[in-house]
Each structure stands twice: as structure tokens, then as C-alpha cells.
């Protein structure tokens, strides 16, 4: 659950790509920064980049305001190899207040509405992982 959004909706870990970093390097760094561990195997990455925009009424409620108006994302799927105790969202610069495992069938309804189309697209592209 995001710390900086008043809605109480959930979100998968995500983040930006730093200068001189490729998407694969970024996803490993972001995983470590946001959930405190990178004890996982990468099993799939999306074939496409997916865009979303944050609605202006939502931007007005966020502490970072208009600094980010949306994102273009490359998605990755991982198989976690560790123990649940390794997952710690109270990192140096926390973005989440709590975490949970979720069934993929319940994922979209728990996501902030403006990102639901993105999650629907990824669930379709990654559908073979859920059989």
C-alpha cells in the first residue's frame, strides 16, 4: 500500500531508470530499494512499454504535486526465492506502508483506478504465468 496516496489502494513496486542504467539494472535496484530484498529470479519481461497519466485531480492530492504526471513502464515478473521475513517495506526511503501477496484475479480491483488499464494489459501479457 502506498504511503503517499490517500486512497488506500495498492500498487506493485515500480520506479524510474537512472542515467546510464538499463531497464534490467533498474528493476533489480528498485526491488532492493522498495522491498528490501532482491532474492528472486526474473522469469519474464513485457514485450511492450505501457503508458499511463495521473489525473489532474489526483495530482492535486499528492505530496509531490506535478513533479511526475505519469510514467512509461516496462514490466517484469519475478519468482521470489526467499522467506517472507526478507521483505521489508520500511526501507531507507519508504514508499509503502505495508505489503501483501495477492491473487492475480484480485489485483486490478485493488489498484488505484487510473492504473487499472496498465495492470489489465500486463495480466493479459503475463497470463501463462498464472496457470
Task: Spell out what each predicted region is.
Residues 1-12:
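N-terminal strand-loop-strand
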Residues 1-2, 16, 41, 111:
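Structured beta->alpha junctions
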Residues 12-48, 103:
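The catalytic Nudix box helix
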Residues 16, 82, 106-107:
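Short, well-ordered alpha-helical scaffold segment located
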Residues 50-86, 100:
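Active-site-adjacent beta-strand/loop module that shapes the phosphate/pyrophosphate-binding cleft
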Residues 86-91, 111-113:
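Short, charged, solvent-exposed linker or helix-capping segments at domain edges/interfaces
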Residues 92-96:
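A short beta-loop-beta micro-motif enriched in histidine and acidic residues
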Residues 104-131:
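Charged phosphate-binding loop/patch that engages nucleotide di/tri-phosphates or the phosphate backbone
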Amino acid at each position: 500500500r502506498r504511503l503517499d496516496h490517500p486512497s488506500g489502494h495498492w500498487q506493485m513496486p515500480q520506479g524510474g531508470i537512472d542515467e546510464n542504467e538499463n531497464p534490467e539494472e533498474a528493476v533489480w535496484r528498485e526491488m532492493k530499494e522498495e522491498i528490501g530484498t532482491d532474492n528472486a529470479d526474473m522469469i519474464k519481461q513485457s514485450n511492450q512499454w505501457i503508458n499511463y497519466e495521473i489525473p489532474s485531480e489526483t495530482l492535486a492530492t499528492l505530496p509531490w504535486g506535478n513533479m511526475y504526471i505519469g510514467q512509461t513502464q516496462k514490466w517484469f515478473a519475478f519468482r521470489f526465492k526467499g522467506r517472507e521475513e526478507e521483505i521489508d517495506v520500511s526501507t531507507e526511503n519508504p514508499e509503502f506502508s505495508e505489503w501483501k501477496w495477492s491473487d492475480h484475479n484480485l489485483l486490478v480491483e485493488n489498484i488505484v483506478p487510473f492504473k487499472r488499464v496498465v495492470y489489465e494489459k500486463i495480466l493479459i501479457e503475463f497470463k501463462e504465468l498464472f496457470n
